[in-house]
Curated annotation (Swiss-Prot):
Oligomer status and interactors: Monomer.
KW S-adenosyl-L-methionine (keyword) present: yes
Pathway: tRNA modification; tRNA-queuosine biosynthesis
EC number: 2.4.99.17
Cited SUPFAM superfamilies: QueA-like
GO biological process per UniProt: queuosine biosynthetic process; tRNA wobble guanine modification
Annotated protein name in UniProt: S-adenosylmethionine:tRNA ribosyltransferase-isomerase
Catalytic function, reaction form: 7-aminomethyl-7-carbaguanosine(34) in tRNA + S-adenosyl-L-methionine = epoxyqueuosine(34) in tRNA + adenine + L-methionine + 2 H(+)
Length: 349
């Protein structure tokens, strides 16, 4: 299976670089996986597709202001993007500088704060800060907007590049399907008899890394930390017992649930995952998916293709481009019902 099979043309004008005035103001492209039928809706129309007894699973990770600017004590400017918080004072981070800092180098953070480069782990740098990391990031850090947004972060991004139910700090990218939900919509969903549960997956910067191989099977996924609690396992079991559907809000919720059910049975799990879902891989838990539109040739587009079927997904994306949908993190959304017999690119005769 070739990465190039997942390419599509996207006009630059369709990349959403700012959020809409209202979270729920986005459009919603509904894809019925079994039939391939499309419906063009507003995000608030999602209520029409939910049933009493369904279970919606959200990712409650909280985006940290993970981007720092500063300089080495020796002089050169640099940019730090925290990838993972290791403990109260240490992080793994990407460092951009004209010359990479050496072990023992001191880093002076703009706005106040210092760090020492402790060790290098492949492309990541282990940094130890002179004070607690999370309060420092909240004070002087910048929201880590994705590269394709292509603008400096603004004050409003602290609120809008964050879900309203974000709770557990640790992500350096938002679980963007959740950005469409405001408190009023969540209340309407609950009033309809739809249950909710929360997993945690701390989204890493690796989610934006391009696939650098020609064949999908040769790709190695980045690792991210997740937790699926016993409460979630019990909620899924109760949903199944009453005939409801499990609806994942975002690909991170899909990856969390399917990581915890790799042997076919959902179990409580806490730890790293490198699960790579592409056409041909079965789904054990998720029945429906709320998701944004993803980058060409990305692992997330491959996940959606595995869920809905490759021809159905690519046809939906072509329709979205034609109809002027807004793409990526601050863009519009899809609601997808799983295709029970999805076809891959190799099935296109």
């Amino acid at each position: 299976m070739r990465v190039a099979d997942f390419s599509f043309e996207l006009p630059d004008s369709l990349i959403a670089r700012h959020p809409l005035a209202e979270r729920h103001g986005s459009r919603l492209l509904v894809l019925d996986g079994p039939s391939g039928e499309l419906a063009h809706k507003q995000f608030t129309d999602l209520l029409e597709y939910l049933r009493p007894g369904d279970l919606m699973v959200f990712n409650n990770t909280r985006v940290i202001p993970a981007r720092l600017f500063g300089q080495k004590a020796s002089g050169g400017k640099l940019e730090v993007l925290v990838e993972r918080v290791l403990d109260s004072h240490r992080v793994l981070a990407h460092v951009r500088a004209s010359k990479a800092p050496k072990e023992g180098a001191q880093i002076l953070i703009d706005g106040g704060g210092e760090a020492e480069m402790v060790a290098r782990h492949d492309t990541l740098f282990e940094l130890r800060f002179s004070e607690e990391v999370l309060p420092l990031l909240e004070r002087v850090g910048h929201m880590p907007l994705p590269p394709y947004i292509d603008r400096p972060d603004e004050g409003a991004d602290r609120e809008r590049y964050q879900t309203v139910y974000a709770e557990r700090a640790g992500a350096v990218a938002a679980p963007t399907a959740g950005l469409h939900f405001d408190e009023a919509l969540l209340e309407k969903i609950a009033a309809k008899g739809v249950e909710r549960a929360f997993v945690t997956l701390h989204v890493g910067a690796g989610t934006f890394q391009p696939v650098r191989v020609d064949k999908i099977e040769d790709h190695t996924m980045h690792k991210e930390w997740l937790e699926v609690s016993q409460d979630v396992v019990d909620a899924v079991a109760a949903c199944r017992a009453r005939g409801g559907r499990v609806i994942a809000v975002g690909t991170t919720s899909v990856r969390s649930l399917e990581s915890a059910a790799r042997d076919g049975v959902l179990k409580a799990f806490s730890g790293d995952t490198d699960i790579f879902i592409f056409p041909g891989r079965p789904f054990h838990v998720v029945d429906c998916l709320v998701t944004n539109f993803h980058l060409p040739e990305s692992t997330l587009l491959m996940l959606v293709s595995a869920f809905a079927g490759y021809p159905e997904t690519m046809a939906a994306y072509a329709a979205a481009v034609e109809q002027g949908y807004r793409f990526f993190s601050y863009g519009d959304a899809m609601f997808i019902t799983r295709n029970p017999a999805p076809r891959g690119p190799e099935d296109q005769a």
